């Protein structure tokens, strides 16, 4: 039985002798997109070819045909191509437009086109996004320049990039620049960007600028420059830094902060790690903020840096809307320049919170008894900058529900301002333990409000239960909690030995 195969049909004619290899197909023949029937029309088209080949006896003549690896030429194969595009979601007219934009598709094997589509789908590009990408960049299906990039995305990055990012990447006009993409990403990975974060990093940069304007050497220089201050960690938190120009932007800005710090690289790095976005501000802007604090608040350069060190956002805070009115408030409360520096070192958030936020908290403080234009009011304002207005209101309500008056709350917060900033839920648990389990009166907090700042399980419960074994219930809250862990442990050991 003689079998003819569309997948591999070859024969050679030599004279003499003559060698003939024929493989006749079964009922259907495979192509890269599926199967189609070996119709009578197809067979009638194939028969003259075979007869012609058999009757032609040129020496050393070889003929081969392969549906899967040969260009798409026959009508049936063109139909298979249209079928492939229909499965993607294109109608016939759209497919014709794509073929007109990229005629190379017709001369590319269905295997290759199908494999390219499968690779894109493995990168989570399906449905309308896939249609849009192919319609916009039909050369994506045939261009060899995409092979290395798609292989890199699938194999090395394990398909971790967001589909939207992949679409942006593969939509670039100049495909030649894609060849450097792999190198740039490998460089970031080599310097410590985890694979699971690389999509975040690339999503945050201006991708076209990174691809077109930054060479691998540029990126290497940038990372090396930032290395003494936190290097790749700063870039991971603020990827857009990669788009900055090293010589005209990053170096002058880092040098300004470093000079302000007294050339302290570690302190400079702390500022950059706390607020990498500070590098988006020009030297002129940063200098304007520093000079304002020096002139209007009477601070020295060293004092300004110490405030920047604990709260770098002061560089981004509006001078007229926030800095000026807050400093005026502190002056009205009686602070001179040294006092203002100490206050701002501990409560710098007062410089940045909104007017609405501060006005709500100021209203609560005045309601419980604080007087306007006093240092006590300022210290209380500094403490409550670390909590929300809602939490502060609930905390005051909680104290009132346990029988404390506004005067009691005022006395407690004057002695220990943090009592107004503690978390409501945590505070409720401590008050319940104090009253229900320790059997104490809530008024004891007036003498020692710092009780509310200790951790319930690891400090309050632990020490109370240890002391309960030897001293009974009547013991000072102050002595119970303020003694060091070492002294408390020794005392507990001594008591245990006496009991034995």
Curated annotation (Swiss-Prot):
The answer to keyword Chloroplast applying to this record is yes
Choose one Gene Ontology CC annotation of this protein and give it. mitochondrion
Which InterPro entries does the record match to this protein?
Answer: MTERF, MTERF_sf
Which compartments does it reside in? Plastid, Chloroplast
Residue range covered by the transit peptide:
1-64
State if Transcription is listed as a keyword: yes
What is the predominant subcellular site recorded for this chain? plastid
One GO BP annotation of this record: photosynthesis
What are the recorded GO MF terms, alphabetically?
Answer: double-stranded DNA binding; mRNA binding
Which keywords belong to this entry? Chloroplast, Plastid, Transcription, Transcription regulation, Transcription termination, Transit peptide
Q: Name one Pfam family in it.
A: mTERF
Task: Name the job this protein performs.
Answer: Transcription termination factor that is transcriptionally active in chloroplasts.
Q: Which family does it belong to?
A: Belongs to the mTERF family.
- Protein name, UniProt field: Transcription termination factor MTERF8, chloroplastic
Annotated organism of origin? Arabidopsis thaliana
Name of encoding gene:
MTERF8
């Amino acid at each position: 039985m003689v079998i003819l195969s569309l997948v591999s049909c070859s024969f050679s004619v030599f004279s003499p002798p003559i060698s003939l290899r024929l493989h006749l197909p079964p009922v259907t023949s495979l192509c890269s997109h599926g199967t189609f029937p070996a119709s009578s029309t197809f067979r009638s088209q194939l028969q003259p070819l075979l007869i012609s080949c058999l009757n032609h006896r040129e020496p050393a003549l070889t003929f081969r045909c392969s549906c899967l690896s040969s260009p798409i030429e026959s009508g049936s194969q063109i139909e298979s191509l249209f079928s492939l595009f229909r499965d993607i979601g294109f109608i016939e007219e759209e497919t014709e437009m794509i073929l007109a934009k990229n005629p190379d598709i017709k001369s590319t094997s269905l295997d290759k086109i199908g494999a390219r589509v499968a690779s894109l789908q493995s990168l989570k590009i399906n449905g309308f996004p896939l249609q849009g990408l192919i319609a916009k960049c039909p050369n994506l299906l045939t261009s060899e320049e995409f092979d290395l990039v798609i292989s890199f995305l699938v194999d090395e990055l394990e398909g971790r990039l967001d589909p939207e990012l992949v679409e942006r990447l593969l939509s670039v006009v100049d495909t030649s620049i894609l060849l450097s993409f792999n190198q740039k990403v490998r460089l970031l990975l080599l310097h410590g960007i985890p694979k699971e974060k690389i999509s975040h990093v690339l999503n945050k940069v201006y991708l076209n600028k990174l691809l077109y304007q930054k060479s691998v050497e540029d990126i290497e220089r940038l990372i090396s420059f930032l290395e003494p201050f936190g290097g790749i960690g700063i870039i991971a938190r603020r990827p857009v830094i990669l788009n900055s120009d090293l010589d005209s932007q990053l170096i002058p800005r880092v040098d300004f902060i470093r000079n302000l710090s007294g050339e302290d690289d570690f302190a400079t790095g702390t500022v950059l790690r706390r607020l990498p976005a500070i590098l988006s501000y020009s030297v002129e802007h940063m200098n304007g903020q520093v000079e304002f604090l020096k002139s209007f608040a009477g601070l020295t350069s060293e004092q300004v840096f110490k405030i920047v060190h604990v709260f770098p956002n002061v560089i981004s805070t509006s001078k007229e809307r926030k800095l000026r009115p807050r400093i005026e408030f502190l002056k009205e409360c009686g602070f001179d320049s040294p006092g203002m520096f100490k206050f701002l070192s501990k409560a710098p958030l007062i410089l940045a919170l909104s007017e609405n936020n501060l006005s709500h908290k100021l209203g609560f403080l005045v309601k419980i008894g604080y007087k306007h234009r006093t240092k006590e009011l300022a210290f209380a304002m500094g403490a409550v900058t670390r909590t929300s207005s809602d939490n502060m209101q609930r905390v005051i309500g909680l104290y009132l529900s346990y029988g404390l008056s506004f005067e009691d709350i005022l006395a407690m917060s004057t002695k220990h301002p943090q009592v107004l900033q503690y978390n409501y839920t945590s505070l409720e648990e401590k008050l319940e333990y104090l009253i229900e389990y320790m059997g104490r009166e809530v008024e004891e907090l007036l003498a020692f409000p710092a009780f509310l700042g200790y951790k319930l399980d690891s400090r309050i419960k632990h020490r109370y239960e240890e002391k309960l074994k030897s001293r009974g219930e009547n013991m000072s809250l102050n002595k119970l909690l303020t003694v060091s862990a070492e002294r408390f442990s020794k005392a507990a050991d001594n008591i245990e030995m006496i009991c034995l």
